[in-house]
Amino acid sequence: MTYLFRTLVLGTSALALASCGADEIVSPGTGGNITINNPPAPAPAPAPTPTPTSTLVTPAAGCPTISNPDQLVNDGTISGPTGEYRVCTMPARFTASSTLPFNRGILYRMNGRVDVGTDGGPAPDGSDGATDSNVNLTMEPGVRVYAAGSSFLMVNRGNRLTAVGTQARPIIFTSRDNVQGLNNDSSSGQWGGVVLAGRAPVTDCIAPGATPGSVNCERQVEGAAQPALFGGATPSDKSGDLAYVQIRYSGFVLSGDNELQALTTGGTGTGTTFDRVMSYNSSDDGVEFFGGRVNMTRLIVVGAEDDSIDTDTGVKANLQFVIAVQRPGVGDTIIEADSSNAFNNSTPRQNTQISNATFIANSGTRDQAIRIRGGTDYAIVNSVLVDRQGATPCLRIDNAETIQTTGDDELGVPRFNSFVLDCATDFRNGSGVTADQTQGIFNAGTNNNANFTNTLSMTFVNGANENGVAVFNPTALSSFFTNPTNIGAVYPGNNTWINGWTCNSATATFDSAVSACTSLPVYS
């Protein structure tokens, strides 16, 4: 009986041991009794960690109310890789000043041509019989606008666009395909673009017999099915303010061979301000300025399929801190400058002046990176031009009127100072101007170098060679300019302006860009 009892105890103990942890067992020794300690009550389970909040955007409940009589239309939602958004379609025309507020879950849509105000005519005082509607369309920082096909934004004379973003929240104009995540680094031409019209002087008038630069000299926006006129005699005219703005995938063909640029200005005046504007993958020009007065700082043009910067019809423009980078194998010129099409001595004569540019030619067209013609006056100072393909000549000048030294509203030959070229071929014969003549004009400037070896990094950031070039003081050209410490667009002490508000692509990468160009940024 004793033997049976011990057997039962041992068997029961083995089962208990199997259910206990090491710290719950007291060793029985070799001959003593076995003691089993009951485990302590388990600690309460911790509170569950909240499920992480998704970074994907969810749509706003509806569209905001605006001051315009015709309201935004709630057109449901649109989805893409960054989430789902409420689609708020703009009216075809803003007839009252209105604000498009930022909302993380809203995208504003243009369905066809969207007009800001009605055309107030070329005269600001009503002497032309037209009445200003004085509409100001304001977009808050972070607003994103998309469109498709022939849709474009038309800011008419006597009205304004106030699109002022911030470094962290730029204002973005883009395409439907971009929203839906369908684009790649070669996509382009998916909607029209942004057009600002003003009353500053232009040439090449559409009215026969009109005097260039006068209140009677007007021009029509290329490709617009309905009248979209610009021009007048008010150099200080104001068409709005643009800052921290991206314009992506523009250039849809409106009619025939007429395409819009990312940004088109027609007769805008000095009252219009531009700072930190980026054009990305326009199927036509990156920006084009038709007449007027344009003052712009910190312009970026990436991937334009025609000209990066096109200037025409008597514009007088000052640009400082400019980056233009072509996609490999794509694009025409970095700069195309004309004055008045076939009227080379019309006035006002174009005078465009650029300081602190970095131009990267990549098209391999074997044409030219910069073409100056049509009797225009032009100045490039404190700048760098590099041909990555080794096939495109740097500089071409056309027409005897472009290098003349006397004439109405004439500043003489093109001016180059502290301008360095890194091309396999520096100069090309033009129409009426030989490569040798162009070289002579270039060599007459100060601190120019046509045999430069670039040391750029990140595609456009100065290296030792660029920082070693003596600087030309551009305030001698215009009080608009500031006197820089170095040539080029990005250099020590001037290398943060590209941060935050830009977008990245295989063509050009910027520090702390707000997103890839193929994606929308997601804001908190």
Show the residue positions of the predicted features.
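Bacterial N-terminal signal peptides that target proteins for export
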Residues: 1-9
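Long, low-complexity, serine/threonine/proline-rich intrinsically disordered regulatory regions
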Residues: 4-5, 33, 42
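C-terminal motif of bacterial Sec signal peptides marking the signal peptidase cleavage site
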Residues: 16-19
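Short, conserved catalytic or interaction motifs in soluble domains
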Residues: 22
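Extracellular beta-rich repeat passengers
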Residues: 25-33, 50-134, 150-158, 174-284, ...
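Ser/Thr-rich, Proline-interspersed low-complexity disordered segments
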Residues: 39-55
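Left-handed beta-helix
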Residues: 140-141
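Active-site-surrounding "flap" and adjacent substrate/cofactor-binding loops of secreted or lumenal enzymes
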Residues: 157-170
